[in-house]
Amino acid sequence: MKIVTFNLRCAWRGDGINSFIHRAGLIYEKIMAERPSVVAFQEVIPASLEVLKRLLPEYEFFGGMRTEQYDGEGLYTALRKEDTTLLGGEVFWLSPTPYIAGSRFEEQSIFPRVGIYTRVLCKQTGEVLSIFNLHLDHLSTEAAQKGLACTVAYIREHRGYVDADKALILGDFNVTPDSPALSPLREEAWLYDATEGITTTFHAFGKRRDAKIDYIFLSEAMRGRVTAVAPWQDEHAGIYLSDHFPVCLSLT
């Protein structure tokens, strides 16, 4: 099965030929060609969510928006119905009070951040995966670090139905590999960074190739099942899938 983290990039008119309306067809073609079982989308707004749902009826979407009013920008995890069944899920805020909508850390930017937990049954194997889709703060390293610590704490507190041996933590972490913000994950012996060999994920629509800020961490127990990890670098006539390269993990 294939699991993808995909920062969609909000629908900004200022992106010109790379505005979402021009990228949507390329995104559709790529997903139809690759047929990933799971796609963890970040930077989803209501308009782009509506387009995705219309283009991809083969997928079930679970997620939510990040503000106190449950609007604006958010995260959604798409599950291919042929391969998976959504058993449950939860939206929680990366903050000292995860169940208060719109809450955030004191060190954070003005934007709240959410985590999307999905409990996913893989039909072919019968196993249940716990997938955490994240988009961390873009201004404060400390807030990003606390967001990851909050996610690890969530896994520990919900061990009754979150199996750490079948857990994946992925998304746009907004920090580079040398950042101390990653310490909550790197200090966990049961986790490893499956994207360690990837050097670039954020490319600003082809303008740079020196920033890796998107990650897929997963349980050490699953390491031997990883057959490939690669960015999707598709481009057509100057149009990219996003300003980030989506990253695809293949599991047996």
Predicted regions and their residues:
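Generic structural signal for small/hydrophobic residues in well-ordered secondary structure
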Residues: 7, 27, 78, 118, ...
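Active-site metal-binding loops of divalent metal-dependent hydrolases
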Residues: 7-8, 134-136, 172-173, 245
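Structured beta-strand-rich core segments of catalytic domains in phosphoester-bond hydrolases
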Residues: 38-128, 230-231
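His/acidic metal-ligating clusters that form di-metal
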Residues: 114-123, 128-132, 144-170, 182
